[in-house]
Every structure is written in structure tokens, then in C-alpha cells.
UniProtKB/Swiss-Prot annotation:
Keywords: Cytoplasm, Endonuclease, Hydrolase, Metal-binding, Nuclease, Ribosome biogenesis, rRNA processing, Zinc
Chief location: cytoplasm
SUPFAM superfamilies noted in UniProt: Metalloproteases ('zincins'), catalytic domain
Cofactor note: Binds 1 zinc ion.
Family: Belongs to the endoribonuclease YbeY family.
Gene: ybeY
Entry's Gene Ontology cellular component terms: cytoplasm
HAMAP family given in the database record: Endoribonucl_YbeY
Name of the featured protein: Endoribonuclease YbeY
Binding positions (Zn(2+)): H124, H128, H134
Enzyme Commission code: 3.1.-.-
Pfam short name (any one): YbeY
Species, as recorded: Caldanaerobacter subterraneus subsp. tengcongensis (strain DSM 15242 / JCM 11007 / NBRC 100824 / MB4) (Thermoanaerobacter tengcongensis)
């Protein structure tokens, strides 16, 4: 597993978050029984930067907490022919962009730690990269159950 982390903001102290994000990504992959080597890029930004990205990619002119950019349908990895796969091959599955500024605001609003919020946003985004969504009530419920299992695995229950 390769995790590339880029702190592109200066408003919130990101000390110690790299290890937490890597743990959250690893726990999500383990919970989903992903055995392939994957690469994930994570960027920490502020509210203004994520607002610009949200407007450009989703047409929504407001800040948000996290954006997920899958690079492939995860089924493409699972359906590849086993004998054609190089054991050393690493699959880049996507990019995660987290507004640390928004994460800090939400942690205060929800009454839990900043670290728990960043871990949750990472898990939520990883599930999107793995093909989950929350467009329907059924999808939302399934995704929430998955999030809770991973957060429990991390010891970060509500």
C-alpha cells in the first residue's frame, strides 16, 4: 500500500495526521478484504481550496469536508485475470482531498476530536474510492455500516 500525503494548507496544524490517515486507509482496505497493492493520494487543503475544487468538479460553489476522485472502477481490479497480474503491480485507486479547516469545524460541532473527524473523512472517502456511494437510502445505510465497522476497528467509535 502506497499513501502519498500532501499538506497544501497552513491554517490547521497537521502534525501527526499522516500516521492516522495511513491507519484509516489500511483499516478500510482490511475491512473490505482488498489484497491488491493500491496507491492512494491524500491532500490536506483549506476551505477556500476545497470550495474551488467542489465548484470545478461538481458545480457546487461551497466548501465541503472531503472530496473523492476515483481513478478506476474497483471491479476493474477484481476482475483482472489472475495470471496476467504482476505481483509487484500497484493500482492507483484515487485521490482524497480533505479540508482540515472544515474537519476542525465539524469536530467542534459534533463534539469529538479533530483526529476522529479526519479518520472518519478518510474512511468515508476510501469507501467512495472502493465503489460505495450514498445516493439512495439503501446505499447510505450500507455505507454508514461500513464506516462504523472501520471506525470500530480503529478504536474510534462515537
Amino acid at each position: 500500500m502506497n499513501v502519498l500525503i500532501d499538506n497544501r494548507q497552513t491554517k490547521v496544524d497537521a502534525s501527526g495526521l499522516e500516521a492516522l490517515v495511513v491507519r484509516a486507509i489500511k483499516a478500510t482496505l482490511e475491512e473490505e478484504e482488498v489484497v491488491d497493492e493500491v496507491e492512494v493520494s491524500v491532500s490536506f487543503v483549506d476551505n477556500e481550496e476545497i470550495r474551488k475544487l467542489n465548484k470545478y468538479y461538481r458545480g457546487i460553489d461551497s466548501s465541503t469536508d472531503v472530496l473523492s476522485f476515483p481513478l478506476m472502477e474497483f471491479e476493474e481490479i477484481e476482475e483482472g485475470e489472475e495470471d496476467e497480474k504482476d505481483a509487484e503491480e500497484i493500482y492507483p485507486i484515487g485521490d482524497i482531498v480533505i479540508s482540515l479547516e472544515k474537519a476542525k469545524e465539524q469536530a467542534e460541532e459534533y463534539g469529538h476530536s479533530f483526529e476522529r473527524e479526519v479518520a472518519y473523512l478518510t474512511v468515508h472517502s476510501m469507501l467512495h474510492l472502493l465503489g460505495y456511494d450514498h445516493e439512495t437510502e439503501e446505499e447510505r445505510k450500507l455505507m454508514r455500516e461500513k464506516e462504523e465497522k472501520v471506525m470500530e476497528r480503529l478504536g474510534l467509535r462515537r
